[in-house]
Amino acid sequence: MTDLNKVVKELEALGIYDVKEVVYNPSYEQLFEEETKPGLEGFEKGTLTTTGAVAVDTGIFTGRSPKDKYIVLDEKTKDTVWWTSETAKNDNKPMNQATWQSLKDLVTNQLSRKRLFVVDGFCGASEHDRIAVRIVTEVAWQAHFVKNMFIRPTEEQLKNFEPDFVVMNGSKVTNPNWKEQGLNSENFVAFNLTERIQLIGGTWYGGEMKKGMFSMMNYFLPLKGVGAMHCSANVGKDGDVAIFFGLSGTGKTTLSTDPKRELIGDDEHGWDDVGIFNFEGGCYAKTIHLSEENEPDIYRAIRRDALLENVVVRSDGSVDFDDGSKTENTRVSYPIYHIDNIVKPVSRAGHATKVIFLTADAFGVLPPVSKLTPEQTKYYFLSGFTAKLAGTERGITEPTPTFSACFGAAFLTLHPTQYAEVLVKRMQAAGAEAYLVNTGWNGTGKRISIKDTRGIIDAILDGSIEKAEMGELPIFNLAIPKALPGVDSAILDPRDTYADKAQWQSKAEDLTGRFVKNFVKYATNEEGKALIAAGPKA
């Protein structure tokens, strides 16, 4: 049994006093009772749905609040954190010690004299590189969320649990002094890397706790040479590991969920001396337009112990997954064992031999697959390119490019080149190959079919792409296969999908200009400057 007196003393050391009761690492059964009990009001209230899962609302915060994210500027962070600047804006805004202390006082005062849920878990399936996390909250469903998302310790591990990092969630409190303190709003998500504490105020969005710890793994791991990556990962029957990087909507979850392979994880991973390991103990899946037919694994994972966020629940308790009236970002969190085809008992495997960058190019320029050199790997990893189609009033659809460093700029705490260095070093040691896979559009105006994309992924994973005869795509100087089994050869060179190849040329020059302009911010150090040659040249 965990010594609750010890836990109370540790809470007092944080500034949380006169706690009425500590509900320590509650069971799923207990959480279910707590979040559905009569008398709960507002966003604390859980609603039982016909799926068996409980649904909650997070109010106006239906996604992360990057504008309210701050990191304390001190001796430890001043020269290590990738701070926002005029030339390279990001979400790492500095906060002084006095402001931090006032926010900490607000949160600890909010949590004092309350009945609290304290959940201890691990971030990272690697014993050597994990962070022991303690989450303190007064809200039952928030305790449920972190029980789903972090790795659940055994009874034995809980006996002597020493937290490396504490998340204090004070979602009910806001900051009245934000204007004088020069902050963005009354809400805050603040980190102190010296005290190893995250404070949350004002926002009820569950993902702040998950992505907050991801940002911290992104700080601590690369500094000791361990990869920290925004990617999904799976492993084949022979132990061959593949990792899939990609921004939202590029196919990261869909393509890594493969009946022929076991899932390691769907979102956050590390790469250490043993191999690839999941940071999480659960999945946080989008549910908008979810159907059993299209995503059977996720659909079937929504049952008792899963937690739905911001979905529309009908009067009979059924869920309308097509209703995005609260937000398009409807979500479900569930423990990873709700998915059948997973790596057990620990979500980790050997070194990755295939590294896949997914992009959905709405410009119709990039090839469906290309093999990258080590320099190109760094260049396209730092660029983190994808493009969306946005409708205009005349009915013309124009592509909007997105460049997100390392396919996850919102969560990077160090300079992007540090992640690229670690990735390429790990890849070289493992003899891994990198591929750029475009799941977007080509000259036909249609999106590349999921059948062809799956054929491409199969060719990468079974090694047949290595035997293919290769050509080169000009401007980008990318190596592209001339034929692949099960894939329409007519699409492999994007120029061939245009009736007029000059059209591809002009679009390629346009996209090149955007890549070049975006990459300027990385040319501030020698490594960055050296990579310019690996990018496209008009």
Curated annotation (Swiss-Prot):
SUPFAM superfamilies reported in the protein's UniProt record: PEP carboxykinase N-terminal domain, PEP carboxykinase-like
Keywords tagged on the record: ATP-binding, Cytoplasm, Decarboxylase, Gluconeogenesis, Lyase, Manganese, Metal-binding, Nucleotide-binding
Main location: cytoplasm
Binding site for Mn(2+): 211, 230, 267
Database matches in InterPro entries: PEP_carboxykinase_ATP (IPR001272), PEP_carboxykinase_C (IPR013035), PEP_carboxykinase_N (IPR008210), PEPCK_ATP_CS (IPR015994)
GO CC annotations on file: cytosol
Cofactor note: Binds 1 Mn(2+) ion per subunit.
Binding sites annotated in the UniProt record for substrate: 64, 205, 211, 331
GO molecular function terms attached to this record: ATP binding; metal ion binding; phosphoenolpyruvate carboxykinase (ATP) activity
UniProt xrefs under NCBIfam families: pckA, PRK09344.1-1, PRK09344.1-2, PRK09344.1-3
Family designation: Belongs to the phosphoenolpyruvate carboxykinase (ATP) family.
Full protein name: Phosphoenolpyruvate carboxykinase (ATP)
Taxonomic source organism: Haemophilus influenzae (strain PittGG)
Classification lineage: Bacteria, Pseudomonadati, Pseudomonadota, Gammaproteobacteria, Pasteurellales
